[in-house]
């Protein structure tokens, strides 16, 4: 019997190829989109879950209180880890992680600057699951000058030699011995590194700060079995105050597996990666629903043409139960074929999708089994619902009435299809409007004026003892025609940190805690970055006090001080007691996702970490070569290493750009699926009304009138979908935009454009079938009447 059902189903597929293609392809594309998005979402959700101790791992974070506002910080003081472990019951172990990049590593004739180095406590390799291919994780980081490297680094420096025991020289002075080789760090680890060095080395080199008021490093803890997060949070809440009584900082633990999706830094909690997971999950659901609606719509429409088949089967002895099983089986087989085809599409497209998403995606992702089981369930449900109309309605017909042609599709079935079309286009419109707003917001952030010029600007890290040659290098560069300006700073201008270090000015409430961005700079900073001044002047060598005694602040500081003019006012901050000589116009010194906060800069040449060089526009290659030639002349022992500031910004928003591209693709596919369904439905509607069209043409109806008649119903359904979608999209996207400090407007043109696109899609889908029906010779439609 089952074999017979399959044979009949295959026969129907080949007999009605167009219908079968539209129905199966639409559902398959929808399922494939859902699977691809699900794999991406599951990969996002899988971050850091591969660690054996993942459920008991946490990052220590801070909530700093400033004038009623909370500044959330993910870095902590250097000595916090051991102290919190020793003094807090329930904490099993602690590990500190410090970024220690920017080191020159040399082995024989190979020398490279390495940026992806972490200095960690020895407990790091016991707490976290980062297996070693060579070496012992329990002892690999015990010696201060030991080094654990990745396979890639081992190949880079030692080729096919055994790296164990080899000596690498750091910054031409300190020798480190390779004591371990790491397996490749999984891509779904938020901690990424190529090398691990002992934290003890930093202490020995005097590169740590024992103050509990300085936040620079990450601190991770592992809880004892059976200890709850709430218990430990209660114990550590006021820990900083036991060391710094004047502090307004609280501690809390962040579950390690939540860091990738839910971490935030600063005053405002932005949407973060979790928001995009929610968006893509909704898109996957919408696309799948649209595809399933298509399938059910076309199946019920097509079944109306099979009444005579039902009559003939009953005449030759088929029972109603046989027909019910036949229609259910046929519908489920159709849906199953679509599922198999979807799996094949995903397998074929996964490499390209991985490249587009910049991820290592595969079927082997945690949770995919549950998704597949769910999709199989949806396949069966869709097949059963789509088969219910022919199985239960058509199978109840009396053969005599069917064969006389006196049975017609009821109003209930027609209205059901109309409801499905409206629902389908409502979802499509939500996707179109939502994707447009998301893409518009991403474009707005990337195009937003920063308040300083990032074009043709490079920065050079002043690593190791390069800093000693800074002034000589600057003097050589400023004489070059390819260079328009040279300066230095302790931070790159797109990532200036904030500080709460004892700010004061006349009239300030001593109890008022404020957080101010701070960067040490060199002369020519304002001019090189092309920052606009609102009041006062830039730093000048002509003023002796400008060296470590003068401040330039932004408009936010001036507003904080509450005075019309702050130039000439006394101002103290981070141990510098001086005077404000100028006010800069506000500029973005962190991500454009963040609100511009107060900022102060001061000339302190000893604290410079970066050289900033503005190249002459035009032949950038020649300008870079000129800078490199000067570098090699002044600092021959170190390779020339630089970054373009605008490329840094591109990297900063690259993930969001990729997400915007993915949103566009999936929305286009969703609309395409809706088009397929509407095209098929229009075809069957025209077929059902063939006789009516013939009569109308005999009575004098023109081709345009008949075309309008057939298109009108679908246009009205799409307009109704707009009425339903607009308020949902407006309130949904308005809420989403509130996650951003600086956001684009929710223009009414977006909604009008979405409506126009939906109507255009409907016209393109329906008009072909309508025109074909309208130009048909009425004699063909009425020849049997």
Placement of each model-derived feature along the sequence:
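Hydrophobic alpha-helical transmembrane segments of multi-pass inner-membrane transport and secretion
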Residues: 15-41, 273-308, 335-336, 416-441, ...
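Small-residue-rich transmembrane alpha-helices
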Residues: 32, 36, 241, 252, ...
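Alpha-helical transmembrane segments
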Residues: 29-58, 349-358, 427-455, 735-743
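Membrane-helix entry/capping segments
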Residues: 2-11, 15, 51, 213, ...
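Intracellular coupling helices
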Residues: 6-22, 26, 291-334, 396-407, ...
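Mid-to-C-terminal secondary-structure elements
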Residues: 118-134, 145-275, 472-655
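Membrane-proximal juxtamembrane linkers immediately C-terminal to transmembrane helices
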Residues: 42-63, 89, 131, 189-192, ...
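Hydrophobic, regular-secondary-structure patches
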Residues: 44, 53, 58-116, 123, ...
